[in-house]
Amino acid sequence: MAYILPGSSLDADLYAITDDALSFNRSVIEVVKQLLDAGIRIIQYREKNKSSNSMLKDCITIKKLTEEANACFIVNDHVDIAVLCNADGVHLGQDDLPVDKVRELIGKEKIIGLSTHSPQQAQKAIEMGADYIGVGPLYPTKTKKDVCEPVTISYLDWVVSHIAIPFVAIGGIKQHNIQEVIQHGAKCCALVSEILSAPNIPLRIQELRQAILLAHT
């Protein structure tokens, strides 16, 4: 098992992110249940086309499910919803509220992750007190419309060599390239469409974990 935050609840090899639009008409709650049953222990709630009230209802339910499974629950962007549902943490983008200000709102016990796309952003994330960073997008991706150009494996190599805090590799990671990501030093990989769009989510997760094991041999 790979560690993102040793000794904390944020501890896993795969980091799953929700997206209703990619879930084959399965509800986000159904998807989360399948993820947890398949052994996923970090789930980020990222929904762009729902009302705040709908997102809060989802997150209250997901928090209960993840708590029962001893899994970590992260809310994307919405600090208010993260606080109201008592999520384990929040994940921020470069254009979201500053990490240090969010820390004042959610407290020292909660996890704050920050997406980064360059060495400068990674270093600033550390200075501002992020608990972990997202590293990517490593490959082309259509999951997010407002994503920057791929930072490529070279940025991952830089992070592995220079950054001491935990990080999550993300962006265009698939079954066919996850071994490359692991071999370049990533301990945790975030995936969206590769998991959510699979007809059989537990089977896809099993296949991904087999690929990760092969990367270590």
Curated annotation (Swiss-Prot):
2-[(2R,5Z)-2-carboxy-4-methylthiazol-5(2H)-ylidene]ethyl phosphate binds at T141, K142, T143, G172, V192, S193. Mg(2+) binds at D77, D96. GO terms for biological process: thiamine biosynthetic process; thiamine diphosphate biosynthetic process. One of its GO terms (molecular function) is thiamine-phosphate diphosphorylase activity. It catalyses: 2-[(2R,5Z)-2-carboxy-4-methylthiazol-5(2H)-ylidene]ethyl phosphate + 4-amino-2-methyl-5-(diphosphooxymethyl)pyrimidine + 2 H(+) = thiamine phosphate + CO2 + diphosphate; 2-(2-carboxy-4-methylthiazol-5-yl)ethyl phosphate + 4-amino-2-methyl-5-(diphosphooxymethyl)pyrimidine + 2 H(+) = thiamine phosphate + CO2 + diphosphate; 4-methyl-5-(2-phosphooxyethyl)-thiazole + 4-amino-2-methyl-5-(diphosphooxymethyl)pyrimidine + H(+) = thiamine phosphate + diphosphate. Its cofactor is Mg(2+). 4-amino-2-methyl-5-(diphosphooxymethyl)pyrimidine binds at Q44, Y45, R46, E47, K48, N76, S115, K144. Binds 1 Mg(2+) ion per subunit. Its EC number is 2.5.1.3. Pathway: Cofactor biosynthesis; thiamine diphosphate biosynthesis; thiamine phosphate from 4-amino-2-methyl-5-diphosphomethylpyrimidine and 4-methyl-5-(2-phosphoethyl)-thiazole: step 1/1. One of its GO terms (cellular component) is cytoplasm. Keywords: Magnesium, Metal-binding, Thiamine biosynthesis, Transferase. It is an enzyme of class 2 (transferase). Pfam families: TMP-TENI. Condenses 4-methyl-5-(beta-hydroxyethyl)thiazole monophosphate (THZ-P) and 2-methyl-4-amino-5-hydroxymethyl pyrimidine pyrophosphate (HMP-PP) to form thiamine monophosphate (TMP). Belongs to the thiamine-phosphate synthase family. This is Thiamine-phosphate synthase. It comes from Lawsonia intracellularis (strain PHE/MN1-00).
